Amino acid sequence: MNRRDLLKTGIAALPLISVATAQEIAAKSKGLPPLTIKDVKVITTNGGSHYRWIFLKVITSEPGLYGIGSANNNYETMAVVAALEEHLKPWLIGKDPDRIEDLWQSAQMRTYWRNGPVNNNVLSAMDMALWDIKGKRANMPVYDLLGGKARDGVPVYDHQGGKTKEECLDALQKSVANGFTHVRIQLGGYGGGGFTPQGEGGRPEGGYQGPAFDEEQYVDAIPPLFEFLRDKAGFGPKLIHDVHSHLSGMNAVELARRLQPCQMFYVEDILPPEELAYYRNIREICTTPQAVGEVFSHPLEVVPLVKDRLIDFIRCRVVATGGITPIKKLTTLCEIFGVRTAFQEGGENDPINQIASYHVDISSTAFGIQEENHFPPIVHEMFPGIGEIRRGYLYGSGKPGLGIDIDEALAAKNPLGPIKDGGAYGTDRTIDGAVVKP
């Protein structure tokens, strides 16, 4: 072969080499292989206690790869279970789990009516499971996919209370000794200090005889409690109080005004969601920080309060607002307007919802505080990788995805019990028998 033939052969081969190389590079740069959702499983359990927990397991076409999400709703449990099994499951199977945003949007629109709590619970379970899958595929915790850690641990506030001021002081000091810097204090239960005892007071003939809530009595009782705590414990502990939406407009304004000298970290749910306009009145008269959002399920409940800076903390529950995808967007909105997060994770909340909040909180500069939840030992056994609270901080496992799993066999041994009164939330009443908003 002469020089000219050699050159011709070489030149002719160049495109072939380039194409082969390009194909090899393209194959290597495609990343992970495509996935589909192969099956969807609904898991329910009482958590070995009084809980009514609902979880979703999204199983992919890759052997051993699945995600877990929470659909927790203690009060309409079976409605959520039916929505997951009968409506979401057949719609979700066969879809691409990598398309989290598209699946969230289309899952919301598939019901036509949207933003209700049951539908949001369904969205949340799917969304958390998809983020769990995404993190496991990337071999990264979800918080790394959200931008990485913005802090080393997530501070949580402790729950305390007592029947008297002295009992409340003892409880506060116990929390501080255990490393908590933020403590929520209640005088008895929700509305405590504002109840007329059973059968006492002027009541309608043949009417309601149970403990009766009185707004003015409550407004008179709570400020002296926190004045006492500040006098005895000083201004070091960051104090929180939950009104639990028991007050109407001007009584809420008056309580906020009276609590200003106590320098509260915040007052929680001082107004019911039907009377949010009164937050403007509170802002105009005092600087007592306000937190709200526990029962919110629609973004338009949140946006006006945040953009007008009428509140200081947003207290949405991740599982009630649709999951990690929408709550991360809400957190970004709050950051722009200087509002902080205080996600609601106590009470009947579950470990998966708690750890989903953790991933958002640890990666956000809008974070303020997270509510604690102490689970019994059986729950720690049932949920490998459960979050751990130590000295006032919540820590995740650091494993890929959400970093938490569920022991399905143990969950099955602790099934949901009978539903009392249809799962209804308890109702407080006034002395004349009228319903008090929770």
Where are these regions (language model features)?
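N-terminal export signals
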Residues: 3-24
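C-terminal segment of N-terminal export signals and the immediately downstream linker at the start
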Residues: 18-49, 66
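Conserved, mostly hydrophobic/aromatic
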Residues: 37, 64, 88, 126, ...
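Short beta-strand elements
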Residues: 54-62, 387
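Shared catalytic-loop signature of beta/alpha-barrel
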Residues: 86, 102, 257-266, 272-401
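Extended hydrophobic packing segments that form well-structured cores
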Residues: 402-438
